[in-house]
């Protein structure tokens, strides 16, 4: 099932019993976080707060609170189907040369489909049904969540930020949290390596002193939202990928005040500029680590215009100690990552990002080991192949007889197949999440790799232990007798 816009997705979720309308007044200040957190931990439905205290605009929360709803948003019927999306991305990232004419013809439909999903620009769009400009702009009219008691101010969380660098034809889509500091100003918290920050830096170099155009889409269709957090190849735009997920081209409309193009069916659009040099201290905020982050300075985004649909819906979330929505997204997108990694490293049999590891800070890899040192090659590959894992602090690699998603198995492998000194890889001075206060320097820290595989000659001089395996005939006989034993 594919969804044209957020409202279409809401209807689809409601028909499946995956969305609950909340008629009781609930405040965006702390209360929505409590309700959404309890619901997410119970694997409950998406929530549409129809009467947020003090506001006329409904708030949509816990939208991607289960892996199943993430899969639905990507046009898949089950989480398992996300592997097929991963296979498509793996192919597009590094397409294999055709083995012959027949093979070339078989791959042609894939490329034709990708080309046919180029975004479609429209003149009129529902996201511009209502236009608010100049002194009438007031972010205080939006039910922006204040998520945690120690948060400094309301925080925009699901904004899809649209930018374009001066040297690029393609726009960048990124999701960056935005602290509200005035009726028309927010702080754009983008890290220096992220697409929006790179576009801004290039703009300042080429157009010194000139304001940098920015747009933020709130309440886009699910395919576009999820396309912005998926490892899309650099040769494929997020909008085109969203079209592939949705099954039809993404409709875009030109902003009223710039040449940026935004999702035409989004609920709310913020248009404006960043004035070079205008910075402000951001935070503290409770984040996905379960802690409040330290204060740091980031650019200020001045909102010059708000356009929106009639009776818009505000899409929001919170981040905190896992499980939260980012952790659930990580669980679902994990299935997309597996085929992409296997394309580069066919020896990998599974890859798992434990949600307890704050979405990406720890990875467990199982593999078919083929030579001494092989596990170390794989762990180094995980850190370097996809930029999504540049902040992964711990990589555990073990054999394919281990279930990467079962801590009982993983811990057994670590404690029986590892020598701490020989099998631990430490790398210093590597990129680390700026929200990671455990690193000695902000944005720079170490990584640890754990080789929990069976050791080959060259890695050890000792006779390696043999795993105990039960006798299959005895197991079958006891299976047949079990009911007669009266044990359970």
From Swiss-Prot:
The active site is at residue 287. Keywords: Cell membrane, Decarboxylase, Flavoprotein, FMN, Lyase, Manganese, Membrane, Metal-binding, Ubiquinone biosynthesis. The keyword Ribonucleoprotein does not apply. GO terms for molecular function: 3-octaprenyl-4-hydroxybenzoate carboxy-lyase activity; metal ion binding. The keyword Flavoprotein applies. Pfam families: UbiD (PF01977), UbiD_C (PF20696), UbiD_N (PF20695). It is found in: Cell membrane. Belongs to the UbiD family. This is 3-octaprenyl-4-hydroxybenzoate carboxy-lyase. It comes from Pseudomonas putida (strain GB-1). The lineage of its organism: Bacteria, Pseudomonadati, Pseudomonadota, Gammaproteobacteria, Pseudomonadales.
């Amino acid at each position: 099932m594919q969804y044209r816009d957020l409202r279409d997705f809401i209807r689809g979720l409601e028909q499946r019993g995956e969305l609950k309308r909340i008629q009781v007044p609930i405040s965006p200040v702390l209360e929505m976080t409590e309700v959404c957190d309890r619901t997410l931990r119970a694997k409950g439905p998406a929530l549409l707060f129809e009467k947020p205290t003090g506001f006329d605009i409904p708030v949509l929360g816990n939208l991607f609170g289960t892996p199943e709803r993430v899969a639905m948003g990507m046009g898949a019927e089950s989480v398992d189907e996300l592997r097929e999306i991963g296979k498509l991305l793996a192919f597009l990232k590094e397409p294999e040369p055709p083995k012959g004419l027949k093979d070339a013809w078989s791959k042609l439909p894939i490329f034709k489909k990708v080309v046919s999903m180029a975004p479609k620009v429209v003149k009129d769009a529902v996201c511009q049904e209502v236009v608010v400009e100049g002194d009438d702009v007031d972010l205080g009219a939006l039910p922006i969540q204040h998520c945690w008691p120690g948060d400094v101010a309301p925080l925009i969380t699901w904004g899809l930020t649209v930018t374009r660098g001066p040297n690029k034809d393609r726009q960048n889509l990124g999701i960056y949290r935005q602290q509200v500091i005035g009726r028309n100003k927010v702080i754009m918290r983008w890290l220096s390596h992220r697409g929006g920050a790179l576009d801004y830096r290039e703009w300042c170099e080429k157009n010194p002193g000139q304001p940098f155009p920015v747009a933020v889409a709130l309440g886009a269709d699910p395919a576009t939202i999820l396309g912005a957090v998926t490892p899309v190849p650099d040769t494929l735009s997020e909008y085109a990928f969203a079209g592939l997920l949705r099954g039809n081209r993404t409709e875009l409309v030109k902003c009223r005040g710039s040449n940026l193009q935004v999702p035409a069916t989004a609920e709310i659009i913020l248009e404006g500029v960043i004035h070079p040099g205008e910075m402000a201290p951001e935070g503290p905020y409770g984040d996905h680590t379960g802690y409040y982050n330290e204060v740091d300075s980031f650019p200020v985004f001045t909102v010059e215009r708000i356009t929106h649909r009639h009776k818009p819906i505000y899409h929001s979330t919170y981040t905190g100690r896992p499980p939260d929505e980012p952790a659930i997204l990580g669980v679902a997108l994990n299935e997309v990552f597996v085929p992409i990694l296997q394309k580069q490293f066919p020896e990998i049999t599974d890859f798992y990002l434990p949600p307890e590891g704050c979405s990406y800070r720890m990875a467990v890899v199982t593999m078919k080991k083929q030579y001494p040192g092989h596990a170390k090659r794989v762990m180094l590959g995980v850190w370097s192949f996809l930029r999504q894992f540049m902040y992964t602090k711990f990589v555990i690699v073990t054999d394919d007889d281990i279930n990467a998603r079962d801590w009982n198995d993983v811990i057994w492998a670590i404690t029986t197949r590892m020598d701490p000194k020989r099998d631990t890889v430490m790398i210093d001075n590597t990129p680390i999440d700026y929200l990671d206060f455990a690193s000695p320097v902000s944005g720079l820290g170490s990584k640890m790799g754990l080789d929990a595989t069976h050791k080959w000659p060259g890695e050890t001089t000792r006779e390696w232990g043999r795993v105990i395996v039960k006798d299959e005939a005895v197991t079958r006989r006891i299976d047949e007798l079990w009911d007669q034993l009266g044990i359970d």
